[in-house]
Amino acid sequence: MANQSLKETPKTQSNPQTQVQGQNQQPKQKTVKLIIKRQDNSESKPYEESFEIPYKENLNVIACLMEIRRNPVNSKGEKTTPVTWDMNCLEEVCGACSMVINGRARQSCSAIVDQLEQPIRLEPMSTFPVIRDLQVDRSRMFD
């Protein structure tokens, strides 16, 4: 079911072997679409921004966020500020990368794209104040 929801987009390079009667039939590349609830700071109004990244097998949500950080361009092709979030161990132990993924709180390091409905919606944990984007202030846990 999850594989059927992966979006396919044409590759950017033309292949002469795929042209049929003057039409450019480009092979399709699978992509992962993410809709991220963003917020510039704790006082600003939240907004949503969409991103599409190339699909890779066994990709987790945190790897998607790292790809967006490497290339911060939204699905409209506009350059944007990199998304911020917390992470630490990347081994499903610490919980620092926890966020709301498709309406459910879970760790982004263990959330595998193939097992998620697309588009994947990411939001900050609602029980903590937002610092920026998916990054929240957990300091009250340690008081």
Outline where the language-model segments fall.
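Signature of N-terminal electron-transfer/Fe-S-associated modules in redox systems
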Residues: 2-143
